[in-house]
Amino acid sequence: MLFRSDECYSMIGKPEIGYKLEDGVRMAKVLEKEGIDAIDVSCAGYDTYNYWLEPTSFEPGWRKYMAAAVKKEVKIPVLAANLIRSPKQAEEQLEEGIQDFVSLGRTHIADPHWVNKVKAGKEDEIKRCICCLYCMESMQKNAYKGTHAHCSVNPKLGKESEHPIANGNGRTVVIVGAGPAGLMSAEVLAKRGFKPIVLEKNAFPGGQLQLANKPPLKEKINWCIEDLVTNATHYGAEIKYNVIADESIIKSYNPYAVIIATGGKAIKPKSI
């Protein structure tokens, strides 16, 4: 693993502490002569944390030039992550000669079936990592408690041994609200054999994610909305927009169950 520390330190106001890209390339050549089989190119360090474990503001592939610089100077295989978030991006970087192998980290946390979906030509069903870092936050928080990490787009993380019972038998479940909770509920219920019908008062899905995606550099949150809709409908959920889910409308579906997923209520701390 190579760290282009100098650039990363400069970004946090501490220039000239680390070493530069050319130093990393020189180290790669030395390591190759020493007989290593391959090299995995990354950058930064624990005190420049967000330059190797990027938040949502970073563009996919932003550090691929580092892998390319190493690739030009060594003959052994080069691996790199480069914040890869789509099969197309991975293929492009391989074809461009930037690297020989693709490394996927958080990508597999968000969707452990990523590779199988690509092999099966089901790229549109991939749940993309939005780089929110909730996985790292939860790991740090839960490490002392001995519990697992969590993922904003993969609620099954850490619960892989739990298998929902497929006992829907085609029964209808009405879900009020097409936000993340409602859409995820629809997907899970559809997988279990229920017939989920999502009623959304707006003309679009997403719920409060449609607020969270508005600040600058938060565009990846749109991926979350797109992937939730794609997977829910793929498994058989029906989403109806511009519907006010009053009692009469809900009863008209003769549902086996009703889920109210209209979003949480904001609270104002007493201290402010």
Where are these regions (language model features)?
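Beta1-alpha1 glycine-rich phosphate/pyrophosphate-binding loop at the start
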Residues: I175-E238, N242, I267-S271
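Surface-exposed alpha-helical segments enriched in charged/polar residues
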Residues: K29, A68, V229-T230, K251
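Short, structured secondary-structure boundary patches
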Residues: E59-R63, S103, P216-W223, I239-K240, ...
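Flavin-dependent oxidoreductase catalytic cores
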Residues: M1-V176, P180, M184-K191, P196, ...
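FAD-binding core/adjacent interface of flavoenzyme oxidoreductases
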Residues: I130-Q140, A166-N167, Y235-I272
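Phosphate- and divalent-cation-binding pockets in alpha/beta enzyme and binding domains
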Residues: Q89, Q208, I249
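Short alpha-helix boundary/capping motifs
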Residues: I98, G121-K122, L217-K218, T233, ...
